[in-house]
């Protein structure tokens, strides 16, 4: 299925039903009083997160959503039927913005919890409501009010505990395949990953976390180059970022310069991302079989980046070092969630 993480739609809540103008006209009550009933409220529009959805593609084909209008009141003091509410299912992690003002209306991250987006119109009042001691035959009613109408911008931000950063072909997709049940596409060319992918990493029968793989970044991504700039927003909800570096690139490029280019793109896009815990993952150590050469390369990268946080040396394709990495991630995530509780 095509991955779509942005959509523009219009929603319109139902109009309230009009109040009824009516008088009792029965065989033995020739001059009966007013009996016009109120209208029904218009249907409201709710958004609800569903774990079964992972893309906004449905909103590319259906762009207008309208709730049911309330029915008008009737004689005999009968109230009009309320318009049926409309509940729109969206993926977990959907942000709902007012497209005209840019205001964030809702961050829908709890499955099964309806969130009101557009309020239905209020019902009109029948003439019975206006009966008084000085006005026994009121001919006054009120119409139902219009429901709220909004132009919306939907933005999906995937919910993941761990985000993978790196240049194309750094081995991010290979890593997520190695440690989870994800079937991310892997090939020996840049931009194999075209949209964010999620993998559930299970470290024990009762402990797991979610890892997100986004398309590789290139220099100038913050200004729109490559593919990754569209998906940097998906890293905003993560607890920790893994900076994946190819320790022995086949094109002979400098891993330190490559890593600095990625950090520069993060700084330009959103400096707050740099405040998250970031661990360095040096991948493809299998490409340097000589232990001394490998250790010298690792130390030169750490020194060149002036890296102070945790460093893991792994071979994703051979799953070397991946278990230790996953256990350390689970421990950090547990600690962060406990501190937030």
Swiss-Prot record:
It is found in: Cytoplasm. Residues 1-159 form the Obg domain. InterPro entries: G_OBG (IPR031167), GTP-bd (IPR006073), GTP-bd_Obg/CgtA (IPR014100), GTP1-OBG_CS (IPR006074), GTP1_OBG_dom (IPR006169), GTP1_OBG_dom_sf (IPR036726), OBG_GTPase (IPR045086), P-loop_NTPase (IPR027417). Its cofactor is Mg(2+). GO terms for molecular function: GTP binding; GTPase activity; magnesium ion binding. Monomer. This is GTPase Obg. It comes from Legionella pneumophila (strain Corby). The gene is obg.
